[in-house]
Design a protein with these regions (language model features):
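Conserved glycine-rich acetyl-CoA-binding loop
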Residues: 54, 68, 81-92, 104, ...
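Active-site rim helix/loop that mediates acceptor-substrate recognition in acyltransferases
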Residues: 20-60, 64-65
Length: 181
């Protein structure tokens, strides 16, 4: 596997195919409700490519609030092609994501995931008990990592998206563009 790099917008279709392979039911998850219609945080969409150049791993982070006045990042989805799961690529993607978020000055990262896996990166449910997600989720899987000590102290409330919205043209703009063509 080559180095972990910033994801390119041209990789959107390959990323969606990889996510469909690894997480076919991801659209049903509460984390998706938070990500819908939003752009990932700048510089926090990472990709890994196999020896042939194809996308084999991806992770993204999204701007959210951990309750009122508590900016945070939501990590996910993290996906690695099944052929590359035994080589530590998921861990490398996690370490790169955490390191990049820290270098960019972010305070905390939240995720919904398997606590035993994410504990090795410092994630825990210790300070997420007063936070909740929209929709159905397994509370014990809501985990946090403070990049700055005390960043989750007093975090309470609904985790809400705050990132840039995806620009969607209005119906009138689409009609005008079609008429002009």
């Amino acid at each position: 596997v080559t180095e972990i790099v910033a994801e390119k917008w041209e990789e959107a279709a390959a990323r969606e195919s990889l996510l469909d392979l690894c997480m076919p039911e991801r659209h049903l998850k509460s984390s998706e409700r938070i990500r819908e219609g939003r752009l990932p945080a700048d510089g926090l969409s990472l990709a890994a490519h196999g020896p042939d150049g194809r996308l084999v791993g991806t992770v993204r982070l999204w701007h959210v609030t951990a309750g009122p006045g508590k900016p945070a990042l939501l990590l996910g989805p993290l996906a690695v092609h099944p052929w590359f799961r035994a080589c530590g690529l998921g861990a490398r993607l996690m370490e790169a994501a955490i390191g990049t978020a820290r270098a960019r000055g972010h305070d905390t990262i939240l995720l919904v995931g398997d606590a035993p896996y994410y504990a090795r990166f410092g994630f825990s449910a210790q300070k997420t008990g007063a936070l909740w997600m929209p929709g159905t989720y397994e509370r014990h899987r809501l985990l946090g990592l403070e990049l700055k000590a005390g960043a989750l102290d007093g975090a309470r409330g609904l985790i809400s998206p705050t990132g840039a919205q995806v620009a969607v043209p209005s119906l009138a703009d689409l009609i005008a563009a079609a008429s002009a063509a």
